[in-house]
Amino acid sequence: RDSLEKEQPDLRMLVNSAGFGKSGSVEEILSEKFRIQTDMVDVNCRSLTRMTLLCLPFLRAGSRIVNLASASAFCPQPYFSVYAATKSYVLSFSRSLGEELRKKGIVVTAVCPGPVDTEFFNFSGKPQNILKKLTMAKADRVVHQALKDCRSGKSVSVYGIPMKLTYFGTKLLPHGFLVRMQQI
């Protein structure tokens, strides 16, 4: 914070991409390591919010904030409960903040990819759900789409037809049905 106040930078883009997830039931993860779920909240929500608030005074018209959410934000995810909840926070925070900053000409985009072929799964565990395995995206394609959507002023960036169908499906279908479909 002191460095920012001293240097008074003209920030054009803030990318909040830190985050992690852990697959398994809440109880299984709790027995593995007590703090892992609260650490997930700290990294995925608190750190993103803190970084945004620290940088906000140095953004101006034309600046962009890109927050990495997830398609997990669209609907509850059994066996990925805390992660999905943190990403719902990121999506909601991004949309709300984007509306607040719109009149200042600052765009906030929540990036909501499905599974992406990255080191994320080395820690979280490999996807067990066949749909997640089939919809795995390449990181460079997700980033390209996110930057394109950010430049276009979109509040939400969703990569690929399967995830776009998921996004719209979660708006049309009851969440109870969608939660059961994830068990396939």
Enumerate the predicted regions with their spans.
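Residue(s) in the substrate-gating loop at a strand-loop-helix junction
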Residues: 70
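Conserved mid-core segment of classical short-chain dehydrogenase/reductases
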Residues: 21-38, 79
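Active-site-adjacent segment of SDR/Rossmann-fold oxidoreductases
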Residues: 58, 75, 96-106
